[in-house]
Amino acid sequence: NRAAYHSSCSNFDYTAHLITDGNTDVQGDSKITVQYSDFPSGESPENLFDGSPNSKYLTFHSEGWIQYEFANGASYIIDRYVLTSANDDEKRDPKNWTFSGSNDGKNWTLLDTRSDIRFNKRKESLSFTAKNTNAYRMYRLDITDNRGDNRTQLSEIDLFEKNVSRIDRSVFSSKWESAGKEDQWVYIDLGTICRINKVKLFWGEEFARSYQIQFSTDKRNWRSLYSTNEGKGGIEEIKLTTATAKYVRLYMTGGISEHYSLAEMEVYGTGGVIPKQMAVPYMGKEGAYYLTGGNWKVQRASLVKLDGLEVSDPVFDDRDWIIATVPGTVLTSYLNIGAIPDPNFGDQQLQISDAFFTADFWYRTTFIVPNKYKEKRIWLNLNGINWKADVFVNGHRVGDIKGAFIRGKFDITPYVVSGEKACIAVYIHKNDTPGQITVQSLNSAGKNGGVLGADNPTIHASVGWDWLPTMRGRNIGIQDDVFISATNDVSLIDPFIISDLPLPDSVSYTHLRAHETVLDL
């Protein structure tokens, strides 16, 4: 995992940093296309298939088509579709349309026609039957008129085969994809001067015929060590004359299609930066054992095939996970090991994949339970996570946290032994409605917040606020202290004080009453 940069990208998801994430498996993608691309920032066609009625797609036309193509070349017999109206002006609702299917994008079969349809309220979902017995890769909703406005909008489209939704919102393809076919480049920052002798390229479907492998020590002066006009795609292993460089660039000058796509770029040699873990856990003055730094690791959940019971086993192998910063967001962990460009510098947030970080992640750590906790009631405390979390200790699920700013305290006495190793695993859930990327400009700051507010309590401003850009991942992670504490079997918890004043005389004396809850374990 090293920071990588691109000359352009086709969207906010397929950015250069994905060429060093260690994932060489390029999945096909569902493709969403529309007749008109004049939608405002934050109201893109992707909103139609995000599963949230709180977002929408808008075009400045009274008509226009919307097309969905299934991922990985899949085809389905869609016999029902559902449309959801948007949040405001009913005059923008579709009124007349056709619904068609195709396997090549050229020849379309009409499956349904509707006229004079009216939504009775905002964010209302209406279901329609399609007379269909054939499987198609693509489906198109062609809106021929709306209810009277010069703009058309919808919140959601869903496609069903025998009452099973075929919109797969979990597909993620780890690749960089350029915005065009003209000369394009991606380069990797190795973090320090290294000796390089080989580069391995893992191409997507859209590979370069003509390209160069270039080296640099300063990002300004580049020298080419390899050049070809006969690129073959797939996996290309290029042996090089050993050279020193801090930056390695793939410079593409000719390809087979309208884009270039690259799943992974591996650089071989000697040298390089080795991330180091933070300070080890320590005992606080109040007797709490703080698990700051130490052995924390983090990994995207899609790359972990086991469940929490197995991940929280102390012998679980997490060698391919990255070192985590705790407390901190997932994005902070990747930044601190040099795996992504610094999003606080210039417009470099556009170099970081939103889809990669807007996902579920696993955290885990191992530690030795303090001997001083022997014969005590032992507690695991998490002072703050975002967005939601499932918590596991030594192969047992101990509880969950249902939102940011909510503290979690779990009795782990049955699962740990003083003086022995223990493991904590925390599954962090992404936001249900993370919203779309907004790009600020001199003409518009974009929206303040947005649909992310439906997930409150969460970090609402992370979707974008005034001229603050959208944070990749929406600040999910373990954001506050994690520590172990010990008590006796009876504790006084949740204390609070009530002040009784003898009004109107508020000077002579005050009566204080203390209240608490007795926790008897």
Positions of predicted regions on the chain:
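Beta-strand-rich interaction surfaces with strong enrichment in secreted/lumenal proteins
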Residues: 55-58, 128, 174-178, 351-355, ...
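Accessory beta-strand-rich segments of carbohydrate-active enzymes
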Residues: 223-225, 237, 247, 282-283, ...
